[in-house]
Amino acid sequence: MASRREVRCRCGRRMWVQPDARTVQCSTCHTVTQLYSLVDIARGANRIIHGFQQLLRQHQPQHHEQQQQQMMAQPPPRLLEPLPSPFGKKRAVLCGVNYKGKSYSLKGCISDAKSMRSLLVQQMGFPIDSILMLTEDEASPQRIPTKRNIRKAMRWLVEGNRARDSLVFHFSGHGSQQNDYNGDEIDGQDEALCPLDHETEGKIIDDEINRILVRPLVHGAKLHAVIDACNSGTVLDLPFICRMERNGSYEWEDHRSVRAYKGTDGGAAFCFSACDDDESSGYTPVFTGKNTGAMTYSFIKAVKTAGPAPTYGHLLNLMCSAIREAQSRLAFNGDYTSSDASAEPLLTSSEEFDVYATKFVL
């Protein structure tokens, strides 16, 4: 036999009744209490829900069904395009940010990225499908140069890197400086790249760029960065800076920090920057007749004219010569578009090396 169940009267008295009892009278206050089983409660709840659903259907706007039909007739949203496989021997990330519609917009950055792609494919043997382009002209949301997408692309570039991998990172856009808060900068300033949404999402500072792009490089892997932006000298936070004189002599400056390791995991990293950390880069129509980054143009021209396997020193001298030639021509007609026409390309590296003995190979 099923055990009795407990009920409580409104006066507080506890009573024990049979499971199938429908009423019970309190022996203290003589109040009669109606009893309900769990089945009765469930049935009542179902009736309430059913009635509420009918009420909603009666008062639903007539055009709602039409809206539902239209939504069902529309094709499903396009899935985000996946990134290409990161496991090719040659791969690149090219970012060009014009900041369209902003008061600080630029004119030649997207063209710079496209010119770099042509160089890598036509001259350096990079497969077209191993090059990730991030510009405002791209159709895929994943290819817009936002902070999130640039970070994701940088991680893709070095993911699973191996010996003999050749990796290229190019950025053409705005660069800037901000206060260094971890004490790893000699000048007290962090360098940063400005993605399209930097006003809301923030900049990408050199500490993070080094952590993502430089630190994971394994023995035998090689990264070349080409940065066409202001304040970009040490934007990869590489520890050695090559100071090249006009007569071709050079010396390495050691910027290693005791607070943080800025090298690789055995690989090699090189960066060609448009200018020093405290300088501005230039855009000029003198090279091609339309606005283009002076740094990007001089790099491409030097690679094309240097001959097979030039040294880093030869390449850097050719780049500086191209910039100086442009400066002379622009000084004559006064249409240089940068605030610092004296800026020249700068080479930084994860290690010191003989720039006139080491071959530049992508």
Swiss-Prot record:
GO BP, sorted A to Z: proteolysis
Keywords: Hydrolase, Protease, Thiol protease
EC number: 3.4.22.-
Protein name, as recorded: Metacaspase-3
Classification of source organism: Eukaryota, Viridiplantae, Streptophyta, Embryophyta, Tracheophyta
MF (Gene Ontology): cysteine-type endopeptidase activity
Keyword set includes Hydrolase: yes
Family membership: Belongs to the peptidase C14B family.
Matching Pfam families: Peptidase_C14
InterPro entries in the cross-refs: Caspase-like_dom_sf, Metacaspase, Pept_C14_caspase
Enzyme class: hydrolase
Entry annotation: catalytic residues: H174, C230
Matching PANTHER family: METACASPASE-3, METACASPASE-4
